């Protein structure tokens, strides 16, 4: 791990170069931002998408399923705002059809370094296209655009689908991963492979993340949060890394060859991702980007 620290590059640069992307700091170039009542520049705040918005990278938001879109509040200095935040932000969601609905983005901050505001929505399957989040208040006036696509346009696993069988490394079989866990002290969630977990009739939790490269202010300690949860022996909990041999990234190895099989099999172009499946292997919940 010390070698990883010496040669580390921000992890969002890694996956972006491989045709994927780490998305927590992404922001649509089509966002409209304006201050109200001549707010001093030092007091200006604006929302940034913490997800694939469809402009800077392919969207992963789909129609016909419940979706979650986290936003971060930034200041004039270009840094995320972490103090003095409102508990919620109200706005209006304009759908591709032109229909609008009132929305409330609640603040989430427990256990994470940078609070975010969560937009939860579900739109009909015919409503693919550009959505607009319009916010107009004394503190914040802004329009943020993002794309919502059809489920057939992405290979990302969806709630209700069957888990996909793929090998993940364990303490007894590294499956070519070195290290199998980039946490400073490897976590305990490598006792069973995902392939075996999906064949034993037990519910499964799969966390895809790379804790050793968490180097941005909006990167939450998602693995640590999972470690702190009470253990239930009825569940199989698996942590899967993003790269098979991250040390080789600094050596100039083709990144596509280092992307782990679980990333490819589950259609991800981001991390972290938290997936919960029942004993029937059906996906019951999926949390992306920020928890």
Residue positions per predicted region:
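Thioredoxin-like thiol-disulfide oxidoreductase module
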Residues: 244-270
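Non-globular targeting/processing and membrane-anchoring segments
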Residues: 32-200
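Short active-site neighborhood of thiol/selenol oxidoreductases, capturing the structured segment around
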Residues: 197-213
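Loop/turn elements at helix/coil->beta-strand transitions in domains of secreted/extracellular proteins
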Residues: 201-205, 233-236, 271
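Bacterial signal peptide processing site
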Residues: 28-30
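Typically the conserved alpha-helix immediately C-terminal to a functionally engaged Cys/Sec
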Residues: 217-231
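N-terminal secretory signal peptides
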Residues: 1-9, 17-23, 33
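A short, hydrophobic beta-strand/beta-hairpin element that forms part of a small beta-sheet core
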Residues: 272-286
């Amino acid at each position: 791990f010390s070698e990883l620290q010496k040669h580390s590059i921000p992890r969002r640069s890694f996956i972006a170069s491989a045709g994927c992307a780490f998305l927590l700091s992404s922001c649509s170039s089509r966002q409209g931002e304006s201050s109200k009542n001549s707010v001093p520049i030092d007091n200006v705040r604006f929302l940034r998408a913490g997800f694939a918005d469809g402009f800077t990278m392919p969207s992963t938001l789909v129609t016909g399923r419940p979706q979650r879109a986290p936003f971060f509040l930034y200041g004039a200095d270009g840094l995320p705002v972490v103090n003095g935040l409102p508990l919620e932000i109200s706005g209006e969601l304009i759908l591709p059809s032109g229909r609008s609905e009132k929305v409330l983005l609640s603040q989430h901050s427990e256990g994470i370094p940078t609070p975010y505001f969560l937009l939860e929505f579900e739109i009909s399957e015919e409503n693919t296209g550009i959505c607009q989040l319009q916010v107009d208040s004394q503190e914040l006036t802004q329009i943020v655009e993002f794309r919502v696509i059809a489920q057939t346009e992405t290979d990302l696993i969806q709630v209700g689908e069957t888990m996909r069988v793929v090998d993940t490394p364990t303490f007894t079989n590294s499956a070519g991963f070195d290290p199998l866990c980039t946490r400073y002290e490897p976590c305990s969630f490598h006792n069973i492979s995902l392939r075996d977990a999906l064949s034993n009739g037990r519910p499964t939790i799969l966390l895809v993340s790379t804790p050793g490269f968490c180097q941005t202010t909006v990167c939450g300690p998602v693995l640590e949060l999972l470690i702190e949860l009470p253990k239930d022996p009825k569940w199989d909990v698996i942590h899967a890394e993003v790269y098979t041999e991250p040390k080789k990234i600094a050596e100039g190895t083709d990144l596509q060859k280092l992307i782990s099989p679980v990333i490819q099999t589950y259609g991800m172009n981001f991390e972290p991702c938290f997936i919960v499946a029942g004993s029937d292997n059906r996906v019951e919940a999926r949390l992306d980007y920020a928890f």
